[in-house]
Amino acid sequence: MLIKQKGIIIKTIDYGESDKIITILNEYGAKVPLMVRRAKKSKSGLQANTQLFVYGLFIYSKWKGMGTLSSVDVIDQNYHLRLDIYESSYASLCTETIDRSMETDGISKNSYELLHFVLDKIRQGISAQLMSVVVLLKCMTKFGFNAVFDRCVITQSEDQSKLVGYSFKYDGAISENVAYKDTHAFQLSNKTLYLLDILQKLPINQMSSLSIHETIVDEMSELVILLYKEYAGMYFKSQKLINQLYRLDNL
């Protein structure tokens, strides 16, 4: 049976000397693994079109088990992501998070729309790091946890101007007048907590303007990665590469 589906490549694995296995997240929100024969041979015409982040119309045959890719009508190669190692790494963090948030046979149209949205925003020049924060925030509940950013979890005060950090002891933001109760709380500005709350709750189709200072994005990114580590025991391969890049920059 020949199948045609739009999708985005979220994973690639080399298979033997010349083949590879790709996984696309298709337009219906399903993960589809495909064998690509002779993918690493330039003459096959599939080498460039089966890279990570490629968005296109995938034509493949499938009877039982894994399908076999026949051709790709590329809509957007997202080539710019391969020109900047930081953008590529943060985009990889987006795909890795979405991939791991879904069961192998699960279907999530929202996941496809989220990935399509963030890759489009990165292409428009929006910070790839910021987009990774958006993905991590939107996927939290799929990993079995959530985070409270909009009020003090100790006093229940909703005065966000008084928030000074995130407490893993009390599982949420804390305000300055009770900060002494957790001296190990993760310190960050109330503006960062406010923006985390907005990005967590705001539907992606309402995120028209996304301009946040780099320092605040760094704070947000550091906290959400820590949240995944503490609450879900999650370690991301992409984040490991990002950390290595920053260490090299600081040598």
Curated annotation (Swiss-Prot):
The keyword Transport is annotated on this UniProt entry: no
Keywords per UniProt: DNA damage, DNA recombination, DNA repair
InterPro entries, per database record: ARFGAP/RecO, DNA_rep/recomb_RecO_N, NA-bd_OB-fold, RecO
Key word DNA damage present: yes
Gene3D superfamilies: Nucleic acid-binding proteins
Cystine residue pairs: none
GO BP: any one term: double-strand break repair
One term under GO cellular component: bacterial nucleoid
Function, as annotated: Involved in DNA repair and RecF pathway recombination.
Family, similarity comment: Belongs to the RecO family.
NCBIfam families hit by this protein: reco (TIGR00613)
Protein name listed in UniProt: DNA repair protein RecO
Taxonomic classification: Bacteria, Bacillati, Bacillota, Bacilli, Bacillales
Gene designation: recO
